[in-house]
Design a protein with these regions (language model features):
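Nucleotide-activated chemistry modules centered on ATP-dependent adenylation/adenylyltransferase
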Residues: 1-209
Length: 209
């Protein structure tokens, strides 16, 4: 969430700035100063990449058909359709980070279809992976993270022939190189520092994982 979506007039604009580390530190300082240290502000998810969160989340299948992160489904007027529209960048990104760590039939069962096997989604995935345009104005992960996850799928027989994976493989390797993508993929699974999380909570989370 700390990576911006676009630069404008020399300034970075971040669609999800309120989830960023910079915002977390600033609001924590304000609250601490206003309450004499009585209130703390921190994110329990800060140490983990989106891909790592997906890896942890997929351990429990009981949530498969009740969870959603599709923005098109959250409307003031309500929504009674599918949990995932399958057309927005948010759906495309979530599908992408689950694909390297979840069985294909299970993931397709959650989304209703293989979002990586639809040529119409090519431009969206190019933007998510930094191969075209700009990062989508949605709550999606970092560009290199998406690129690394897509690269991981090029080495999986069950995913390698999907339309998007096979089409973007050469461009991914040209832009980033296999060494950079391999390193990024490994780094995604390494938990970051827990400096802003109270020690007791950090210890309990580490034990649970």
């Amino acid at each position: 969430a700390s990576e911006g979506n676009i630069s404008f007039c020399g300034r970075e604009a971040n669609h999800q700035y309120s989830k960023s580390l910079d915002f977390e530190v600033r609001i924590a300082d304000v609250l601490a100063a206003a309450t004499g240290g009585a209130l703390q502000y921190f994110s329990l998810l800060r140490p983990y990449s989106e891909a790592r969160i997906a890896q942890i989340f997929m351990r429990e299948a009981r949530f498969d058909h009740v969870f959603s992160s599709c923005n098109r489904n959250f409307r003031l007027a309500g929504h009674d359709g599918p949990l995932w529209c399958g057309e927005c960048p948010k759906c495309h990104f979530v599908f992408l980070i689950f694909a390297p760590v979840m069985a294909q039939d299970r993931l397709v069962g959650i989304f209703g279809r293989n979002l990586l096997d639809d040529p119409a989604h090519e431009h969206s995935y190019r933007e998510l992976t930094g191969l075209a345009g700009q990062k989508p104005w949605e709550c999606v992960g970092e560009i290199l993270e998406a690129a690394a996850c897509l690269y991981a799928l090029t080495r999986r027989p069950e995913w390698a022939e999907s339309a998007i994976v096979s089409k973007l493989k050469a461009d991914l390797l040209t832009q980033y190189g296999s060494e950079k993508l391999e390193a990024a993929l490994a780094e995604l699974m390494v938990d970051g520092p827990t400096d802003h999380i109270p020690a007791e909570l950090a210890e309990r989370i580490a034990h649970a994982l």
